[in-house]
Amino acid sequence: MSQKLILVLNCGSSSLKGAVLDNDSGEVLLSCLAEKLNLPDAYITFKFNGEKHKVDLSAKPDHTGAVEALMEELKAHGLDSRIGAIGHRVVSGGELYSESILVDDEVIAGIEKCIPLAPLHNPAHLLGLRAAQTIFKGLPNVVVFDTAFHQTMPEHAYKYAVPHELYEKYGLRRYGAHGTSYRFVSDETARFLGKDKKDLRMVIAHLGNG
């Protein structure tokens, strides 16, 4: 098999989740979870073919160290040369982004601009993104924004009942969260029911913390 695979990364302030997927079937070939990043006892756990093993990251306990360990794991299984692109979850794209986008310097600057809207998450996403650009040189990186799904809200839904100048001056408005999850659930529900998504009326509950 030589088809290209997709690597997806979800970086938190002290963690990194990753998976390698077959772009056609959606099958997860390898997954990983790095924990306690930026602490002396950082480590990353890999799962491949149903088996798990842990790699110590204490020598380089940051996001870059985790991505480097991931690259070594991919090489060990002959998957590194089959990665065709990298996808990144980013919590907030603010009003700048309403869809997924190919990463360039302008996009990185845009994510930085949105840090005040997600001060815990966006800096961590940028660390993982920059590490991926350095370690997986030449591969396209795409960011998927959690806020993008909710950018379809009409103006009366995303604006609060406060003076308009607060929106104009401070950008005070409603942003939805976990939009990537909601998009998946709504798409799968439409597929399961055999209906067009725009014809559905659904209440969706996001359970969990990620």
Regions found by a protein language model. Name each.
Residues 15-60:
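Short glycine-rich, Thr/Ser-proximal phosphate-binding strand/loop in the N-terminal lobe
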Residues 11-16, 210:
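Ser/Thr-glycine-rich phosphate-binding loops at phosphate-binding pockets of nucleotides
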Residues 122-123, 129-210:
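Phosphate-binding/catalytic loop of phosphoryl-transfer enzymes
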Residues 60-64, 68, 80, 101, ...:
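Electropositive phosphate-/nucleotide-binding environments in soluble metabolic enzymes
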Residues 10, 34, 86, 146:
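Residue-level signal for inorganic ion chemistry
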Residues 2-7:
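Extreme N-terminal starter segment of soluble prokaryotic enzymes
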Residues 74-121, 142, 148-157:
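Short beta-strand-loop/turn "lid" adjacent to the catalytic site in phosphate-handling enzymes
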Residues 49-89:
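Glycine-rich, N-terminal phosphate-binding loop and its surrounding beta-alpha-beta segment
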